[in-house]
């Protein structure tokens, strides 16, 4: 998670630009330069514990006609390798275990993501990684509606400014990979042939600016604001191969394409929805990636936004971005001047989510026991924030959100 002083992306070419050199392995000199520039300390290497199996029970299989796949490359790849059910419907316990087994996402952060995703797109006990599941897959009782899956969680879990997907209210499709956005990401690493946190952070900023310039309903609120920037960090560190040759983790075009279900090179790039794949001979992050990592990486990404407000949205026309006044909506507990200091950013975003949960879950129209799920979520957030000595936030002034037509209190899309 980071930010910027990037060039405004006014438009993307409709035809992918060919950069065949990007597909070639970096030279030894480039590799050493990459390692020198990589700020993250080498965390050690243990082949036996880090290798992720792609054989036997975890051999890649294309999804069947009735299998569900969605917008998240990590979830799709885990389903295609059988780390979560190949049908694309996972229980909370299954996904927490799988995220640790494949990506070494620690149970604290993995548990938070799971509980949040299950509440926003599932039945509170599990969820579809894509669209609505069949009734036979559901396990919860007391539901008042049909879960819509992770593909239908706009402004509740999924957000505008995805690094590879369109904004929902701009094109109506926030699930399928936009090859122009992906090509832009591929091209951005050309000078050194690798992808690091600066490359992904700068790409996130360009996507932010593209959304502002093209989506009149672009919105980036508190409850989803961490998603685009978290994605930048997760792709950088968790899609990288932490091998003996590069224990700090190196992410190249080959591995990036594998996780995003893209094949070919240059002008022959091809995206096949739902065919995401864990690369062979791939070693996961060496230690648990947890909330402390998320907080630190978010500051790295958000700092790239320089003086441009990172929260808020367009007010019904393109290029009408109006930022949220952090001090105003938090009663002065947080402010723009100190938001990137210490753990303030993480505390603000995670703590601020609590005040949106009742409406988001209720307006989802699925879970009957709203108070029970809210209690579970707030308890999880409280536990996560306990080590960070966060300032006490007593509420969020939601009236400030009324000017944003892209904000919908988490109501299902029509």
UniProtKB/Swiss-Prot annotation:
Glycosylated sites: 187, 241, 328
MF-aspect GO terms? metal ion binding; peroxidase activity
Q: Which cofactor does it need?
A: heme b
Q: Where are the transmembrane segments?
A: none
Q: Where does heme bind?
A: 72
Give the pathway: Mycotoxin biosynthesis
One matching Pfam family is: Peroxidase_2
Highest taxon listed in the record's lineage: Eukaryota
**Record's note on what induces expression:** Expression is positively regulated by the dothistromin-specific transcription factors aflR and aflJ. Dothistromin biosynthetic proteins are co-regulated, showing a high level of expression at ealy exponential phase with a subsequent decline in older cultures.
InterPro entries per the UniProt record, alphabetical: Chloroperoxidase, Chloroperoxidase-like_sf
For this protein, what is the EC number?
Answer: 1.11.-.-
Signal peptide from the UniProt entry? 1-18
Keywords annotated in UniProt: Glycoprotein, Heme, Iron, Metal-binding, Oxidoreductase, Peroxidase, Signal
Q: Explain how, and how many, cofactor molecules are bound.
A: Binds 1 heme b (iron(II)-protoporphyrin IX) group.
In the record, the note on similarity to other proteins reads: Belongs to the chloroperoxidase family.
According to its UniProt entry, the function of this protein is described as: Peroxidase; part of the fragmented gene cluster that mediates the biosynthesis of dothistromin (DOTH), a polyketide toxin very similar in structure to the aflatoxin precursor, versicolorin B. The first step of the pathway is the conversion of acetate to norsolorinic acid (NOR) and requires the fatty acid synthase subunits hexA and hexB, as well as the polyketide synthase pksA. PksA combines a hexanoyl starter unit and 7 malonyl-CoA extender units to synthesize the precursor NOR.
Q: What is this protein called?
A: Dothistromin biosynthesis peroxidase dotB
